[in-house]
């Protein structure tokens, strides 16, 4: 209830009229951002007949890049990845250019998990937000996190103005 109160009671749909529509996935480590990114890409491709692009923006966990590439192959959705040697900001810049050249309707940016109190990593998210200008910023939350999630959501919202939340592992 507190999370709903924090984000607002109004339900809204993603507006796909702007091309590309940019969705940025944020949250704590292990919350399910990468898997959720793939699920959202599948939904956007099948239900809305859009051409999504997955962006591997987690430069701290090589397995996340591999996982997203595997999901992309399974879903027949392209994945823009540069491994872990470039900054998240540079990867997102490259992805924006790639999407423009390849007519991708929707860009889904999978970011690295981080603690809300880790200021340098939170600043990285703010930088990515500035570059990508996302239409949606979704906080991915492990449903087993407990009451502290209200503080986590408030911190992410203060820094990024999140537009929604996804509860995982229900």
Language model features: what each stretch is:
Residues 1-57, 64-84, 92-100, 105-109:
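Primarily NTPase-proximal linker/entry elements flanking Walker-type ATP/GTP-binding cores
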Residues 31-33, 58, 114, 147, ...:
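Gly/Ser/Thr-rich helix-start
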Residues 55-56, 81-82, 111, 139-141, ...:
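Thr-Gly-centered strand-to-loop micro-motif
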Residues 61, 84, 113, 145:
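Short, glycine/acidic-enriched loop or turn micro-motifs at the edges of active sites
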Residues 62-68, 149-152:
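Short, glycine/polar-rich helix-capping loops at beta-to-alpha or helix-loop-helix junctions
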Residues 87-101, 116-170:
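Conserved catalytic-core segment of NTP-binding enzymes
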């Amino acid at each position: 209830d507190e999370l709903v109160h924090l984000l607002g009671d109004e339900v809204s749909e993603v507006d796909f009229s702007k091309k590309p529509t940019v969705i940025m996935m944020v949250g704590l480590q292990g919350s399910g951002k990468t898997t959720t990114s793939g699920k959202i890409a599948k939904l956007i491709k099948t239900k809305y007949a859009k051409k999504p692009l997955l962006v591997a923006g987690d430069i701290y966990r090589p397995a996340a890049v591999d996982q997203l590439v595997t999901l992309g192959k399974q879903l027949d959705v392209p994945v823009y990845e540069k491994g872990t040697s470039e900054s998240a900001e540079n990867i997102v810049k490259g992805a924006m250019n790639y999407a423009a050249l390849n007519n991708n309707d929707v860009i889904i940016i999978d970011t690295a998990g981080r603690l809300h109190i880790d200021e340098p990593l939170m600043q990285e998210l703010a930088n990515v937000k500035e570059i990508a200008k996302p239409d949606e910023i979704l906080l991915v939350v492990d449903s087993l996190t407990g009451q502290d999630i209200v503080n986590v959501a408030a911190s992410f919202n203060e820094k990024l103005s999140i537009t929604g939340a996804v509860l995982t592992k229900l």
